[in-house]
Amino acid sequence: METIFAQSSAFGKAGVAVFRISGPKSLEVLQLLTGRADFKPRIMYYQQITVPKTIVNSASFAYKEPRVEPITNRRATSDIVSEGGSIDYKELIDNAMVVYFKSPNSFTGEDVVEIHTHGSKAISIMLINALLNIADIRLAEAGEFTKRAFLNNKFDLTAAEGIADLINAETIMQHRQAIRQASGGLEELYNNWRTQLLKIISLLEAYIDFPDEDIPDSVLNDVNNTHKNLVNEISNYLNDNRRGELLNSGLKLAIIGPPNVGKSSLLNFLMQRDIAIVSNIAGTTRDIIEGHLDIGGYPIILQDTAGIREESSDIIEQEGIKRAIHSAKTADIKIIMFDAEKLDSSINEDIMNLINENTITIINKIDLIEPNKIFSIENKYKCLRVSVKNNIALSSILKNIENIAENMAGFTETPYITNQRHRHYLKQALSHLTAFSLDNDLVLATEDIRMTARCIGAITGVINIEEILGEIFKNFCIGK
């Protein structure tokens, strides 16, 4: 296995930059950079990181921009004068904290070195160039450290995906979902199903391969019961309304309604900045304006849309209305706004057909009508009564959005399907599982279960036929 390295922290100015090296030559590289040999595992050392003499004097070594000149007042004590009269020294890169992790007790399961330098672009460039000029070490590919950890059985594929989701998490709920997955929540669920499938296979293989053995007929009843339970569990699990995927990607919220009812003002309020033009002129918003928001820990993708009205002679506005209706139909949550002064005239069939259980109906500009009309609206329409301009009852909008988001993507005891890859293999697994029947040839029936187990194994990255043999010898005394 090759030795690889990369900067694990973001490139740029920061308090600390972290570099990771993994592979059989990790310790040797650390010794070369520091001139020290006696590194004990899992102990932090404060060391000078230098460009080795062989690299400084090599014609192949050249810094990329920005050019960093040698700092002569920081030469190592081993500086000597070469035969040509020039200075030959180890160039100091930085004073850093370093730590060595011995295989297999590391993130990747290999020998690993971490170097913690100051977060300087120049330091990063110098150290990366120094590492690139050392023999038998190369720059890591994207995700290669995590890939090596998976290959060394540090975690399964779902946990690896959980780590990626954790890095990309922007809200508390996304963090909670990612940390549960990275900690093995999905692995435990899928492995439990796979263990039951392997048990079924081992029982059926015993019937097929050892027909003369005294195997009780009740075993087939156990197979049927386990099969039935698995079909129900996986079917119910797939029927989750994409809760985990919604939490990962964000819930789309479309703000729709007739022209000039305050949709753009509401978008600006929710975003806490002016991203949409607000005007008294109807039809100001022509295209969809999008913003991202965290409400109650849930990622919300806001979309302000063109005002919907039945008649418009403007071709561009007509296209905007089409896009608004499409946005509403594909949205997870909808806010439909009306003007309190023009309520009866602004309600049209196109808008009313968009209302469902995940719709928040809002009557805006409530401050512009008489109190007796407010009571009339309360009796006629189930909605929120607000004034975006004067900040009246706007907190109720946020609370309603949070409640719907929680209902659609809130936590349950069972971990969610978090991406399409899992859903794809689970659908395949269920297809093979429902095809299974003991009325069929036992060899074919066993193959259906085997394919189901392989689909589950493809999710976690574990596919091993030897496990089936292990189950057979574990549960039966063959050839006693």
Curated annotation (Swiss-Prot):
Q: According to the record, how does the cofactor bind? A: Binds 1 potassium ion per subunit.
Q: Which residues bind Mg(2+)?
A: 264, 285
Cofactor(s) this protein requires: K(+)
Which family is it part of? Belongs to the TRAFAC class TrmE-Era-EngA-EngB-Septin-like GTPase superfamily. TrmE GTPase family.
GO biological process terms, alphabetically, are: tRNA methylation; tRNA wobble uridine modification
Which residues participate in K(+) binding? 260, 279, 281, 284
**Can you name one GO molecular function term for this protein?**
GTP binding
Tell me which EC number(s) this protein carries: 3.6.-.-
Protein name, please? tRNA modification GTPase MnmE
Q: PANTHER family this protein is in?
A: TRNA MODIFICATION GTPASE GTPBP3, TRNA MODIFICATION GTPASE GTPBP3, MITOCHONDRIAL
Question: TrmE-type G domain: from which residue to which, for each copy?
Answer: 250-406
Q: What does this protein do?
A: Exhibits a very high intrinsic GTPase hydrolysis rate. Involved in the addition of a carboxymethylaminomethyl (cmnm) group at the wobble position (U34) of certain tRNAs, forming tRNA-cmnm(5)s(2)U34.
Q: Which residues bind (6S)-5-formyl-5,6,7,8-tetrahydrofolate?
A: 20, 114, 154, 480
Listed Pfam families: MMR_HSR1, MnmE_helical, TrmE_N
Kindly list the places in or outside the cell where this protein is found, as annotated in its UniProt entry.
Cytoplasm
Summarize the subunit comment.
Homodimer. Heterotetramer of two MnmE and two MnmG subunits.
Cited PROSITE patterns: G_TRME
Please provide the record's keywords in A-Z order: Cytoplasm, GTP-binding, Hydrolase, Magnesium, Metal-binding, Nucleotide-binding, Potassium, tRNA processing
Q: Domain of life here?
A: Bacteria
Binding residues annotated for GTP, in chain numbering: 260-265, 279-285, 304-307
* Disulfide bond sites: none
The gene name reads mnmE
Q: State any GO CC term.
A: cytoplasm
